[in-house]
């Protein structure tokens, strides 16, 4: 795939910020922002295509305006047989006035016009779609450059709709502007010149006034409709977001029997969309009716003037037909003009929203002169780190600790202590508010984000997979890995045997977010792709907390293999998984209050020991419940677990 320089994206982002700042002003800001993509400096072939398309457009309009003359000549020739007024003998009109010749000329002109238009549109499509591709790619890349905070605060469904509509808006505005708007203006000018020279100033003035009034009414009515379309788009985005959110949480909806509740939420959004859509269609009817009245009045006026001139002996019958043909030819571009204005206005709205995204500056960005991270051993050090998501609520309060190269350090603590925040800071999803984080002595703010994240592998608590094959999801850790390397990673993650039982093996589709796989299977895929990545630093962010005890033990064995000889940070919920850690850090309210090995912390009798004892008591209670349920099941069902009398206890035992 062809790549485009990030500097272009930067220029577009700068233009986008200028557009957002001056949104109430000139909408030509959008055109200025988009023009470099229609007239690309690095593509002389596309520039030549634009120029040639405009030349073809000019020839097509000249042929279009010439077509009514063939009507005039044919009509005058036919009228001669009826004794009507005809052009004087010897004139060009007389010589070309034979009905057959005039009709053939009309046919040739129409064929030429059609061919010129189609060739022009076919050629310009390459320019338009190249602009769409570049802008869509730059916007997509910019979205990935934006901070985690931006994505957490935005609705994914709404964001994808913004990208989709922005892409379509760019396509529409380039096509409508250069292939419809500009040719229509040229045709208007040519028709006025013909009326002024072939007839007189009255006809030109009448048509000019009609065009001006038609466009004024169209602009005012369309501005009114735009407000309605905005409301309709917002309702559509809201309904679409609710639908995506509900379907992504399909199982949760089923757990709580909330189908009717979800349908009600969706229907309320669709009701708002319905009202806005009805208003949109009503306003469109008003617009079309007004346009028809304005054009019909002007057409009738010109025909009356031509009829009076014929009666006065100043015009021929062919002139009457020519005026009618010119006016009717104007109706098509005029009607398109209304549609063009509506589309351009709507496209501007859609592009504005895309520009809003482009105007967002990344919260975390590479500093000028940032160098790649040079990993020698992978030691990590946090020095008096202060961090907050909200300035009024500090999460980490002067946190300091070290993870020696090749060692495993676990971070534990109650909910809200700041455990997962540490992993996000290490990956530099956020910058610290105070202190610094170093890897092998290098401040992570001074190195490139790409090199930093390339050195770190993550196995998260909630693994989300791409809606693709198992092979694709494992190979995501290293796209250039061979099939054998992928299989070896799967064997180390203890998922190769499971994959072998699937009918499609490694090319099995995992479904949306990997929902076709169980939690344990998804975790093994995540472990396999981390093994394939082979990073010197590993973060296990509560990687087994969402799994049952049996699956947890199996996954833990795979994790132990991955962590061997790597600098490893374990964010732990279940303390039984980190008893062998080289050092355990105990956080509470963003502060390090204890550290040491498992034995040292237990002997100290502090918060860690309290958390450990609490978890052990909970585990023993679950074991007692499970055993009681098993005995009850054997008594009632002959060894078959049937605990229908106490489903709550059964669920608690399995949780």
Predicted regions: what they are:
Residues 52-59, 179-230, 304-315, 319:
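Transmembrane helices of ABC transporter permease
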Residues 39-44, 148-152, 165-174, 178, ...:
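An intracellular "coupling" helix at the cytosolic face of ABC transporter transmembrane type-1 domains
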Residues 15-24, 41-43, 129, 137-167, ...:
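Short intracellular "coupling" helices and adjacent cytoplasmic loop segments at the cytosolic face
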Residues 366-367, 373-655:
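ABC-type nucleotide-binding domain
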């Amino acid at each position: 795939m062809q790549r485009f320089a990030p500097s272009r994206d930067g220029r577009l982002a700068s233009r986008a910020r200028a557009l957002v700042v001056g949104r109430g002003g000139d909408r030509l800001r959008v055109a200025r922002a988009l023009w470099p993509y229609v007239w690309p400096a690095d593509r002389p072939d596309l520039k030549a295509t634009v120029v040639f398309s405009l030349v073809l457009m000019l020839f097509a309009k000249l042929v279009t305006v010439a077509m009514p003359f063939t009507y005039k000549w044919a009509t005058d020739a036919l009228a001669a047989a009826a004794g009507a007024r005809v052009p004087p003998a010897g004139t060009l009109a007389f010589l070309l006035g034979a009905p057959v010749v005039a009709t053939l000329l009309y046919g040739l002109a129409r064929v030429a016009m059609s061919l010129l238009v189609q060739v022009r549109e076919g050629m310009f499509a390459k320019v338009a779609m190249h602009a769409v591709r570049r802008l869509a790619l730059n916007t997509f890349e910019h979205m990935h450059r934006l901070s985690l905070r931006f994505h957490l605060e935005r609705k994914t469904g709404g964001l994808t709709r913004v990208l989709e509509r922005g892409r379509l808006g760019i396509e529409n505005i380039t096509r409508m502007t250069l292939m419809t708007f500009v040719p229509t203006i040229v045709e208007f000018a040519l028709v006025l010149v013909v009326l002024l020279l072939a007839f007189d100033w009255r006809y030109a003035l009448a048509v000019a006034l009609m065009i001006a009034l038609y466009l004024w009414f169209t602009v005012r009515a369309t501005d009114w409709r735009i407000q309605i379309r905005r409301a309709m788009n917002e309702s559509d985005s809201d309904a679409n977001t609710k639908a995506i959110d509900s379907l992504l949480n399909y199982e949760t909806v089923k757990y709580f029997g909330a189908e009717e509740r979800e349908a009600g939420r969706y229907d309320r959004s669709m009701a708002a969309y319905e009202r806005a859509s009805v208003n949109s269609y009503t306003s469109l009817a008003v617009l079309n009716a007004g346009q028809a009245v304005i054009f019909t009045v002007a057409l009738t006026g010109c025909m009356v003037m031509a009829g009076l001139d014929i009666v006065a002996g100043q015009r021929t019958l062919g002139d009457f037909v020519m005026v009618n043909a010119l006016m009717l030819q104007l109706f098509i571009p005029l009607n398109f003009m209304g549609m063009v204005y509506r589309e351009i206005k709507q496209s501007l709205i859609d592009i504005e929203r895309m520009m809003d995204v482009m105007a967002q500056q990344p919260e975390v960005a590479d500093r000028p002169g940032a160098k790649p991270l040079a990993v020698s051993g992978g030691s990590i050090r946090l020095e008096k780190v202060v961090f907050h998501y909200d300035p009024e609520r500090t999460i980490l309060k002067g946190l300091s600790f070290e993870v020696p190269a090749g060692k495993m350090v676990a971070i534990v603590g109650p909910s809200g202590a700041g455990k997962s925040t540490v992993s996000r800071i290490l990956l530099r999803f956020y910058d610290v508010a105070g202190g610094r984080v170093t890897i092998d002595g290098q401040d992570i703010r001074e190195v490139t984000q790409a090199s930093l994240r390339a050195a770190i592998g993550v196995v998260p608590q909630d693994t989300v997979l791409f809606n693709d094959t198992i092979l694709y999801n494992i190979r995501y850790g290293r796209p250039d890995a061979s099939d054998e390397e992928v299989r070896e990673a799967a064997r180390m993650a203890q998922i190769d045997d499971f994959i072998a039982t699937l009918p499609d093996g490694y090319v099995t589709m995992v479904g949306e977010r990997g929902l076709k796989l169980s939690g344990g299977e998804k975790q093994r895929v995540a472990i396999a792709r981390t093994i394939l990545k082979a990073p010197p630093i590993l973060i296990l962010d509560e990687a087994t907390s969402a799994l049952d005890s049996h699956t947890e033990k199996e996954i833990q064995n795979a994790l132990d293999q991955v962590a061997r000889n790597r600098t490893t940070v374990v964010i732990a919920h279940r303390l039984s998984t980190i008893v062998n850690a080289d050092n355990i850090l105990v956080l509470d309210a963003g502060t390090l209050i204890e550290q040491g090995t498992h034995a040292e912390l237990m002997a100290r009798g502090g918060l860690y020991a309290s958390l450990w004892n609490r978890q052990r008591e909970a585990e023993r209670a679950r074991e007692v419940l499970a055993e009681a349920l098993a005995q009850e099941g054997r008594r009632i069902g002959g060894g078959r677990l049937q605990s229908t009398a106490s489903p709550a206890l059964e669920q608690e035992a399995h949780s």
